[in-house]
Amino acid sequence: GYGIYLEENRGIKQMINFTVGPVQSCDAVRAIGAEDVPYFRTSEFSEVMLENERLVLKFSGATKDSRCVFITGSGTASMEAAIMNILTPEDRALVVNGGSFGDRFCKLCDIHNIPYDAIKLETGRQLRESDIEAVAKDKKYTAFIVNKHETSTGVHYDMALISDYCKRNNLLLIVDNISSFLCDDFNMSELGADV
């Protein structure tokens, strides 16, 4: 990875990590992560997971009838789960590709035979409605796929613009909010985000 080393602490060099995740954590967070997890076949585990679901839905601004699926895999595994379980080859998606994670969505659509058109953006450039219109033209789509925050470039896409476009065109809105969750505003209900 990319990083710099700071002074030694207790004989261990401290490094600041500049790679795209996993991210640095403070001692208090690492201590919580080191705690034992309840055995998964107990009611205690079920209670913890139900509380986690309640909190994720609350902090995502999801509708009351929403459910949260926890995936014991990478962010890419979650992206793939959304593509392969929500869309079919009968769908057609618009995918914002402004960096490595947008490109990953395109590759996942290829793997799962989901027809799509990519809105290819120059590195670091914000999405504009004219970009959407230039690709969409008179084509019919069923879904719009975007990384709220394209981690590889640092661009936060204009979710109000995307939401408005999806509402006007009756598109399913699939949003990767992995790197923005709890850091940036994201309200699924207000945006009409489906996944």
Give each language-model segment a name.
Residues 6-43:
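N-terminal "arm"/small-domain region of PLP-dependent enzymes with the aminotransferase-like
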Residues 10, 61-62, 86, 137:
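Generic structural signal for beta-strand residues in well-ordered domains
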Residues 19, 23, 28, 51, ...:
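Conserved PLP-enzyme active-site core in the AAT-like
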Residues 33-81, 100, 104-110:
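Conserved N-terminal alpha-helix of the aminotransferase class I/II PLP-enzyme fold
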